[in-house]
């Protein structure tokens, strides 16, 4: 019975087919997908932090409120960028649905990683020349395995 279930691609009693984490082609494609997500998230995230750091300096917002808004804006700009990229391949409303559904977990983990690095290294929502690279590295590496897994398991990607 277990063999019949696992041969159909499902799990039973903790048994499942071995998952291959060593597929170089999938790692490359998932890295490309992660890169586009990182570009979109970074635009909104860095833009929000920079706006509060350089323009709205006396806003009264706490660093945590700024970071929450930066995460939200990062996700929104990533969805907008991914929708624009996908709209070349499909209808705009379908591209929007795919952009939201396929990459939300990736974007949330990316934004959380970037803002945690910012908080740990600068003590708040601050952009300095030396914090941007660690934020981008953390933002890329955190969701990359998930993007690989999703692409490998479901052959599903955002781009």
Residue map of PLM features:
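Alpha-helical transmembrane segments
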Residues: 62-74, 131-139
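Helix-coil boundary and interhelical linker segments in multi-pass alpha-helical membrane proteins
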Residues: 50-65, 120-130
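Flexible metal-binding regulatory segments at protein termini and peripheral loops
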Residues: 1-36, 41, 144, 148-149, ...
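A cytosolic-side transmembrane-helix exit/cap motif
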Residues: 83-90, 147-155
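Helix-boundary and loop/linker segments of multi-pass membrane transporters
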Residues: 18-24, 60, 88, 92, ...
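Juxtamembrane helix-capping/reentrant segments at transmembrane boundaries
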Residues: 90-106
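C-terminal halves and exits of single transmembrane alpha-helices
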Residues: 101-123
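Transmembrane alpha-helical segments of multi-pass membrane transport proteins and ion-pumping complexes
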Residues: 41-50, 74-83, 107-115, 139-144, ...
């Amino acid at each position: 019975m277990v063999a019949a279930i696992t041969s159909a691609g499902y799990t039973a009693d903790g048994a499942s087919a071995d998952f291959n984490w060593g597929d170089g082609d999938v790692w490359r494609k998932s890295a490309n997908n992660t890169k586009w997500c990182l570009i979109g998230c970074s635009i909104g995230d860095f833009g929000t932090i920079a706006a509060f750091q350089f323009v709205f300096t006396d806003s009264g917002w706490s660093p945590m409120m700024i970071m929450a808004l930066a995460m939200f804006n990062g996700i929104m700009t990533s969805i907008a960028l991914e929708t624009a990229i996908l709209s070349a391949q499909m209808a705009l409303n379908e591209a929007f649905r795919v952009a939201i559904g396929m990459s939300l977990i990736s974007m949330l983990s990316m934004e959380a990683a970037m803002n945690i690095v910012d908080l740990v290294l600068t003590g708040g929502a601050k952009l300095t020349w030396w914090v941007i690279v660690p934020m981008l590295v953390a933002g890329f590496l955190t969701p990359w395995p998930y993007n690989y897994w999703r692409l490998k398991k479901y052959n599903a990607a955002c781009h």
